[in-house]
């Protein structure tokens, strides 16, 4: 009611003001400019009498809401899911009501907002499944370290800003830290160099280092089995430490180093002006001495540098000499079709990489591969075999992965092919339990190769995998080919010799097939 009264007062003031200005000799255009309204509004006030203004204000027309009949549905949905957005509600309305009228998003937003205010339904955060935590015992001295990469924009000496990239590693027992900065994104060679600088700084190396599944270190995945880059694999063998990779997109399983990355961003790099990278790394070493490793740790209540004096005696010796890698990365323009032109060929990038004509990526050629890194995050976004021909488009199907049938349908097709064999069903159940993320990919490999073999061959191959604890579609494929060749050879042998074939060669062949596959 107060709003209506105020509205009437405003209109009365405008009505009197328009007439006052007209009496002073101003025309409609001049009055409009003075009051900040349109000329037609001035004309409307001049044509309206004072009594008519009161009459219009007191008469209220009731308009039927265009979405009024959906009020109960929207109200019930909001009461059950108060965190739902107007955009999602719009989609649900179209899904539940095929005859839902064509209205703009703003109309639905206003309607949902009106119902929230009418029934007092506030927008709450979505209830998430609570994750259980427990305090783990401290790891032994010298056993574990955790490593990760970070980046941040910082101001530069001559004005503007630039992004710096850094490698962080922390010894999990003493919380003793090391960081190394770079102007370019980390690739495998630069990451190895940072590792060696850390080992030199520590005066030794731990037995195991925990990482994210970062493509700087991982070349590809073989249906759940991680294949490391050649240079990083050689570095591991040379330094004799064991890499441990966390589950993808699960930073809470590697919390210590995640906190170090955050600590560097929110403490050391805050308001720090970049002079040059060597200077920044020198400043970082001094910061580690006085703050990062020199102050009492918030969790352990111990000073990392003092604890490190104990842990240092448990580290494995490091005898190497860090050698900085040569600068190899160059900037390349991203085309509208999400490709990069390099040496007369086109290499694909994930859909959506291109955003404008200024989009750039870092490109590096290494070990017969073309690696493309995001200039924004420094992360590797694509890796292709180097093509020696010209005019070719090298495309990664993951960059435009089509929708396909579900994993359950694939499993049903395989079971139909093997007439419901129990061992095949058990193998697929175990595969799903052990590699749920890659379950469908493994089934697709089996499904695609099935038409080339009899069901008895497939059953025997799966039986061998089940017996040896191997859950990998490529292993099944290799074994099917091996069993097929063996049966053909046995058939030919039976024609010429009644002696059974030797089994030692068969076992040796199986071992060769399984070599390189992780049993888990």
UniProtKB/Swiss-Prot annotation:
GO biological process, one term: DNA recombination
Domain Integrase catalytic: 136-312
Record GO terms (molecular function): DNA binding
SUPFAM superfamilies: Homeodomain-like, Ribonuclease H-like
Pfam families documented for this protein: Mu-transpos_C_2, rve
HTH IS21-type domain segment(s): 13-78
Stored InterPro entries: Homeodomain-like_sf (IPR009057), HTH_IS21_transposase_type (IPR017894), Integrase_cat-core (IPR001584), IstA-like_C (IPR054353), RNaseH-like_sf (IPR012337), RNaseH_sf (IPR036397)
Keywords: DNA recombination, DNA-binding, Transposable element, Transposition
Keyword Lipid metabolism belongs to the record: no
Keyword hit for DNA-binding: yes
Gene3D superfamilies found in the cross-reference section: Homeodomain-like, Ribonuclease H-like superfamily/Ribonuclease H
Function: Involved in the transposition of the insertion sequence.
Family: Belongs to the transposase IS21/IS408/IS1162 family.
Protein's UniProt name: Transposase for insertion sequence element IS21-like
Biological classification of the source: Bacteria, Pseudomonadati, Bacteroidota, Bacteroidia, Bacteroidales
Gene transcribed to yield this protein: tnpA
């Amino acid at each position: 009611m107060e709003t209506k009264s105020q509205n009437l007062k405003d209109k009365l003031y405008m009505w009197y003001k328009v007439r006052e200005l007209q009496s002073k000799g101003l025309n409609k255009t001049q009055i409009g400019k003075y009051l900040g309204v349109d000329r037609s509004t001035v004309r409307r006030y001049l044509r309206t009498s004072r009594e008519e203004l009161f009459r219009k204000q007191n008469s209220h027309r009731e308009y039927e809401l265009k979405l009024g009949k959906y009020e109960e549905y929207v109200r019930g949905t909001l009461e059950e899911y108060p965190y739902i957005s107007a955009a999602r509600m719009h989609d649900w309305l179209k899904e539940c009501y095929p005859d839902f009228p064509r209205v703009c998003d703003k109309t639905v937003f206003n309607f949902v907002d009106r119902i929230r205010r009418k029934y007092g339904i506030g927008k709450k955060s979505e209830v998430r499944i609570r994750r259980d935590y427990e305090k783990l015992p401290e790891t032994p001295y010298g056993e574990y370290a955790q490593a990760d990469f970070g980046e941040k924009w910082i101001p530069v000496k001559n004005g503007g800003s630039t992004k710096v990239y850094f490698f962080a590693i922390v010894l999990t027992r003493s919380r003793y830290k090391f960081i190394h900065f770079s102007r370019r994104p980390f690739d495998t060679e630069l990451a190895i160099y940072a590792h060696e600088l850390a080992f030199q700084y520590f005066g030794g190396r731990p037995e195991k280092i925990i990482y994210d599944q970062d493509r700087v270190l991982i070349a590809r995945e073989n249906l759940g089995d991680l294949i490391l880059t050649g240079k990083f694999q050689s570095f591991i063998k040379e330094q004799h430490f064991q890499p441990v990779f966390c589950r993808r997109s699960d930073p809470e399983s590697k919390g210590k180093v995640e906190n170090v990355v955050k600590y560097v961003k929110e403490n050391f790099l805050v308001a720090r002006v970049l002079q040059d990278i060597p200077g920044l790394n020198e400043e970082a070493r001094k910061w580690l001495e006085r703050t990062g490793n020199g102050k009492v740790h918030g969790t352990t209540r111990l000073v990392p540098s003092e604890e490190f004096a104990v842990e240092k005696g448990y580290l494995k010796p490091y005898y190497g000499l860090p050698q900085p890698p040569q600068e190899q990365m160059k900037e390349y323009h991203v085309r509208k079709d999400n490709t990069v032109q390099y040496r007369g060929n086109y290499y694909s990038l994930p859909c959506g990489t291109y955003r404008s004509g200024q989009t750039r990526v870092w490109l590096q050629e290494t070990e017969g591969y073309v690696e493309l890194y995001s200039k924004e995050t420094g992360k590797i976004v694509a890796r292709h075999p180097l093509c020696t021909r010209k005019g070719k488009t090298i495309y990664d199907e993951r960059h435009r992965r089509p929708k396909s049938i579900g994993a359950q349908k694939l499993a049903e097709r395989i079971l139909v092919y093997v007439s419901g064999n129990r061992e095949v069903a058990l193998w697929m159940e175990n595969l799903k339990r052990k590699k749920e993320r890659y379950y469908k990919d493994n089934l697709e490999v089996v499904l695609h190769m099935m038409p080339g073999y009899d069901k008895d061959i497939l059953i025997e191959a799966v039986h061998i995998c089940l017996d040896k604890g191997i859950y990998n579609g490529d292993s099944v494929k290799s074994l099917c080919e091996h069993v097929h060749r063996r049966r053909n050879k046995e058939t030919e042998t039976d024609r010429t010799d009644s002696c059974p074939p030797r089994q030692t060669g068969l076992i040796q062949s199986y071992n060769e097939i399984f070599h390189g596959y992780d049993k888990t």
